[in-house]
Amino acid sequence: MDRVTRYPIFSNPRSARVTSLVLDEDTSYTVELVGVGPEAGWSQGDLQAWSTEYQTRPDVKRTNVSSNRRVFLGQQSPRSLYLEDEDEEIKSYHLDDSSDTLCRQRRELEAERWAVIQSQAVRKGGTVATLQAASDHGDLRIARQPQSTVTEEILVDTEQIDFLAARQQFLSLEKANTNPVPCGLTARETFPRTPPGINQAPKASTGPHLANGYTTAVTSPMKEVTLEKSFHVSPARSIHIVNDPGSQTQAESPETPKETPIEREIRLAQEREAELREQRGLGRAAGHQELVQIPSRPLLSKMSLTETPPRRDRGRPSLYVQRDMVQETQREEDHRREGLQVGRASTPDWPSQDPQPGLQRSLSSDCILSPDARATDPAPEARKVNRIPLDAYQPYLGPGTPKLEFSAFGVYSKPSGVSTEDTKATVFQKATESPRHVSESSGRSLSSKQEWSKPPGKATNVGVVRLGNFHLRPLRFKVPDVPQGTETPHTWGWEVAGGPILRLQKSQSSDLLEREMESVLRREREVAEERRNAFFPEVFSPVPAEDESHEQDSRSSSRASGITGSYSVSESPLFTPVHLNSGLVWKVEAPEDSAPPGQKTRKEMWYAGINPSDSVNSEVLGATRVKRHKNLLAERWEAHIYASEDEN
C-alpha cells in the first residue's frame, strides 16, 4: 500500500506470491521456496507450463501459496489476510519438533534478510540469468511424506510496499520487451521458477539447482524449448532445456546473460558498421592495427661513452604524443599502400611477413642503439623513414671506423661480410633493370656516396674523426640540369641488403604541391636577397651566380631524393650550417670572399620573427610603436627634479 495515498499497489491477485519458509529434513538450514504468479501484463488464456519435478521429490513439504513477506512461526496471526481470494486455505506442515521457536524465528528473519540482500546484489549486475516464472492459481501442491503438522497463520504486512515484487514485475516487463517470443510460438512459453531464496541443502542433486544464489527449476514438461531462437549467443554457449532434471549442472546457468539496452545498441551499431564496410568493399576495421610500439629510452648499458645521447632522447615528447605520431605515420603508410596496390609495386602486407608492424615506423635513424642491438634480426622490407639515412653521415666517419649498414628500421647493424658498396651497386643495377623510371638524382647521389665511402678497415672502438672530414663538400644530391617541364618524376628508393627492390612513386598531386612550395620558397629567397642587396650593399656582397644555383640545386635535390629530415638550413646561400642530429654543426666551406661573421649574429638577433636587417620591417615597427604618455610630474621625477622652484 502506498504510504501517502493508502491505495493498494500490489493488490492484484496475479502479482508475485511468496510461500512460507520450509525446513529441510536433514539439516537445520532454512529453505525459502518462492512461487511467482503470472505477471500483470499477461493474458488469462496464456498457456502455462508446470514443473513435474516436485511430484518426484520426497524431501519438500506440502504448502499453499500466499503473498506474505513476514513469517510468524508458532503464533496466531495478529491481522487478517487482505487477499481477494480469501477462501484460500492456508496450511503449513513442519518437519521436526519446533521446540525452540525463538531461535528459529531469529534464524528465519536472518535468512529472509540475507535472501533480499543477495537478490538485490546479484540482480544489480545483470549477469545472472533466471528463468521467468508463471502460475495461474494460488496453490502449488508439492507431495511429501506425512509428518506431525502444526497449522500456523501467516501474516501479510499491508503497510509495507513489496519492493521485491515490484522489481520482479519490472524486470519481467523489460524482458518481454527486449526478448520477443519467436513468431512460430502461439502462446508465451513460461518456465517455472523459484526466485531469490536460500538453498544451502547439502543434497544439491535432488534440490532445486543453484545458479549464482538462485534456486531455479529447469524442466518444462509441456514443451521442449531451445533458447537459441531469442538470444544472440554463440553456438558454443547455446543451452537446450530438456526434460532430464539431472542434465543441468550447477555451474551452468539455465539462460544466457541478459543484454542491457546499451550493449544492444553497441552491438547493433557494430553490426551496421560491418555491413556497410562489407557493402563498400572495405576490410573490417581491426583494432589491433592501431597498436603501435614506441621505443623507450635505451639503457645506460646500451649507450657507449664516445657518443652523445641522440637529440631525441634529450627532450622526448610524452608517450601519448609519441603514440599519436606513430599511429599517424602508420595510417599514412597503410593509406599509401592501399593506393599503390593498383598498377604499381607496393610494399608487402605486413601481418603476413613481420609480426611487429609498429617498430618500423617508430624507430628512426637518430635512435642510435648499440650496433649489435638488432644484428640478429633479419633485414625488414623497405619503409619510408623521414630522417637522414646513415649514408649522409658517411663522409664524416673516419676511414678506420666500420661502415654501418642502414636498415629501414633506423637501427644500425654491424657490417656484414658483403661490403656496403657491393650491395649498393647490385641493388642499383637491379633497380635500373626494372621497367620503372629511376631519377638521375638517386644515381648521382649513389655514385657520389660510393666515391666518399672507403672499404672498411680494421674495426676500432674509438671513433676517429679527422679534421679534413669537417670540411663538407656541398651535399651532392643534385637534380639533373634539365628544365622544369621535362623533369622526371621523383621516386623514393630504399636499398636494403637482401630485401626486395621496391620503388614507391610519389603521387602526382603531392609532386605538384612540392614543386609549388619550392617555387614559392625560391621566390621568397630571391625577394629577400634583392631587398638586402638594395638596403645594405656594403654588408651583403653580391653572390657568385654559380654558387647560388649550386646551393639551390643541392637543397632542392635533397628534397627530390626523399631525404627530408630534422635539419635546418639557414637562409643565406653563403653560410649554411646543416644541423644534424648528432649535436655537431656541419658547415659548408665558405668561399674566400664570404660575408663577415656579423651577418650570423645579425641573423641570431631576430626578435618575434622580425628581421632587424630588414628596413621595411623596421619602418613598420617604428610606425606602429605607441608613444608612452607620461604626465608632467612623472617626467620631472625621472629627471631627478624633486622640488619645484615655486614651492621654495
Swiss-Prot record:
CC annotations in GO: actin filament; cortical actin cytoskeleton; focal adhesion; intracellular membrane-bounded organelle; mitotic spindle astral microtubule end; plasma membrane; spindle pole centrosome
Protein name (Swiss-Prot/TrEMBL): Mitotic interactor and substrate of PLK1
Residues modified to Phosphoserine: S77, S220, S253, S318, S352, S364, S365, S439, S507, S509, S541, S554, S644
Main location as per UniProt: other
Modified residues (Phosphothreonine): T149, T190, T256, T347
Processing and modification events after translation: Phosphorylated by CDK1 and PLK1. CDK1 is the priming kinase for PLK1 phosphorylation. Phosphorylation by PLK1 is required for proper spindle orientation at metaphase.
Signal peptide: none
Statement: the UniProt record of this protein carries the keyword Ribonucleoprotein: no
Stretches for region Disordered: 242-383, 430-460, 539-568
Lineage: Eukaryota, Metazoa, Chordata, Craniata, Vertebrata
Record key words, sorted: Actin-binding, Cell cycle, Cell division, Cell junction, Coiled coil, Cytoplasm, Cytoskeleton, Mitosis, Phosphoprotein
Pfam family, one: AKAP2_C
Assembly and binders: Associates with F-actin. Interacts with DCTN1; this interaction regulates DCTN1 distribution at the cell cortex. Interacts with PTK2/FAK and MAPRE1.
Location within or outside the cell: Cell junction, Focal adhesion; Cytoplasm, Cytoskeleton; Cytoplasm, Cell cortex
Start-end of Polar residues biased regions: 349-367, 440-450, 557-568
Family according to the record: Belongs to the MISP family.
Coiled-coil boundaries: 511-534
Bias (Basic and acidic residues): 255-281, 325-339
GO molecular function, one term: actin filament binding
Function: Plays a role in mitotic spindle orientation and mitotic progression. Regulates the distribution of dynactin at the cell cortex in a PLK1-dependent manner, thus stabilizing cortical and astral microtubule attachments required for proper mitotic spindle positioning. May link microtubules to the actin cytoskeleton and focal adhesions. May be required for directed cell migration and centrosome orientation. May also be necessary for proper stacking of the Golgi apparatus.
Native organism: Mus musculus (Mouse)
